[in-house]
Amino acid sequence: MYEPRVRTKSMERFVCSKEPPNRSERLLQDSAKRLKISRAALEQIEKPYTFIYQRLPVEIEGEVVNISSGIVLHNRARGPYKGGIRIAPDVNIWETNELARLMTLKTALANLELGGGKAGIRVNFEKIYDQFKDKLKQDFYPFCDMLKDHIMKEFVDHFVERGLVHIYIPAPDMGSSAREMMLFYNRTHDPAVVTGKPEGIEGWLPGRHEATGFGTAYAIAKYLEYIGKAPSDVTVAIQGFGNVGSHAAYYLNDFGCKIVAITDLYGGVHHKEGIDVVELMDHAREKRTIKGFDDKRTIDNESMFRMGVDILVPAASGHVIDKDNCDGLGARLLVAEAANMPVSFEAFIRLKEKGIEILPDTYVNSGGAIASDLEYKQGLGGMRYSREEVFAHMRQRFDNIFESMLEIKDQAGSFTQAASDIALKRLYQAMKTRSLI
């Protein structure tokens, strides 16, 4: 069969830099071989439809500071572009691109009528605060909240002016929250403009705030049920105690798991008899960190990764488990990817060889996307869901995904590879149906 020449480096040439090696493309390439999808078709699925760069000027004490931001619209074959807004000092076009691609795969795996997109805002709050602190009257955290509001108002204005309402549907992500989503609603008065809105705002969804953490815990409980192990018989360590990590800890504890170690950016705590998760959540809510919760029993990320536990839950940032540290990983049973792409492709292969199961990010942290789908439809149609209905819907979706992965796991090679196969097949079929490939 004739296969046209594929310009696989077209985006790289345009932005004058090479896309770093990443797991999602490697997995998709392997899936394409198993599914017998051509290189030309895969190129159309892998690469983004468009990306937008936007400078966001904000004034601080009479000086203008320009903040860089970007939106990657990856794929809308199955529905509107969907994905969060990440605010961090290391945001870049390639990370945003891979996160958008992961959203495309995640929504396809969950069989949602949504596509994939992502926004990134590159800002170093500590650096800017240090630059202006002699002139400022606020402490660090109030300054960050004020600056973030100014940045987001600029971002929202450009979002609306570019006609992206209902084309790209934002949501909270690392560095953003319901507070930032409210600004979209304030500007548009459209309950379906974003998901993850604050409680009480038109179109808000009960259970959306904790959905990703609940989904993470439920995915782990589902796996334990599959292998015939009681939650009370396993120990868990969690990296990250933001919205995802804290709620994952809460629900895992509620299901009966023993949470023995938790870390965040500034510190960590280790209680071999089990951490009081509710007390830790109260502490973190007040201090914005878990540091200081128990100064006598602390732990750092490196030590926690090496400690012997049944389940490790990376719930913070990406690429934290790689070829350099995976051999020293202490998890005996499972790594559950609550964060996006926390395990590199090389580490994935090595852990697979060692018999350590990985539940993929596109499954484990899909609770936010599943709940967002309900919130978006609620905003469009005016129907209302209770928290119990939202969680019941999520459980059903997670059950369906797990059974779909399990059905082809042996053929694909792992849960991670099975998830990639399912998502790619659905995307390919949708794009063929719409004559996009």
Positions of predicted regions on the chain:
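Glycine-rich phosphate/diphosphate-binding loop of Rossmann-like nucleotide-binding domains
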Residues: 198-203, 207-309
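Adenosine-phosphate binding glycine-rich loop
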Residues: 6, 10-19, 224, 332-437
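Flexible, glycine/charged-enriched surface loops at secondary-structure junctions
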Residues: 39-44, 111-112, 165-172, 228-235, ...
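Short, Gly/Pro- and small/polar-rich lid/capping loops
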Residues: 14-55
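Rossmann-like adenosine-cofactor binding region
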Residues: 267-359
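Glycine/serine-rich phosphate-binding loop and adjoining beta1-alpha1 elements at the start
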Residues: 88, 107-231
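Glycine-rich, N-terminal phosphate-binding loop and its surrounding beta-alpha-beta segment
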Residues: 54-61, 70, 74-135
